[in-house]
């Protein structure tokens, strides 16, 4: 069974999160954010962080932020919760499966992306979206090949 998709993005700044999440209705969720990512202003890395650890961001605001800014992602943890559902910590795949969280996006070392999603149609769309954007090493994460022990970076 497909759990999600993994691939590599270029180790450079841009709006990669927006490009990665295009198949997802970003505005339909509340996003729990964490990690180390910085805005890029006039081609230079800024001191201002894109995310604050464990902050909850409304979907429409989050979508605008990802779409209209340039940023450099070093480590990222994003977790999408439908409106009206409990936002809680999700640290393992089992916790994810038992929670209201619909999607987990992880970026490690600037380039390595793993996305876990409960909606099989969205997994397929994320896979083909990654191919369309010429991301590298695109593959499905399955029950058989998933070696990740935690959904954190």
Swiss-Prot record:
It holds the Pfam family DUF2691. This is Uncharacterized protein YncE.
């Amino acid at each position: 069974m497909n759990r999600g998709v993994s691939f590599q993005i270029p180790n450079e700044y841009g709006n990669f999160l927006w490009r990665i999440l295009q198949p997802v209705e970003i505005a339909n969720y509340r996003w729990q954010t964490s990690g180390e990512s910085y805005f890029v202003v006039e081609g230079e890395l800024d001191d201002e962080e894109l995310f604050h650890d464990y902050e909850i961001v409304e979907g429409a605001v989050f979508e605008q932020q990802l779409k209209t800014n340039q940023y450099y992602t070093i480590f990222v943890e994003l977790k999408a919760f439908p409106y009206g559902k409990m936002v809680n910590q999700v640290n393992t795949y089992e916790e994810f499966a038992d929670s209201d969280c619909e999607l987990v996006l992880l970026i490690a070392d600037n380039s390595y992306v793993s996305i876990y999603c409960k909606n099989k149609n969205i997994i397929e769309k994320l896979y083909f979206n990654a191919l369309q954007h010429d991301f590298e090493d695109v593959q499905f994460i399955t029950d058989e090949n998933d070696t990740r022990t935690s959904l954190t970076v």
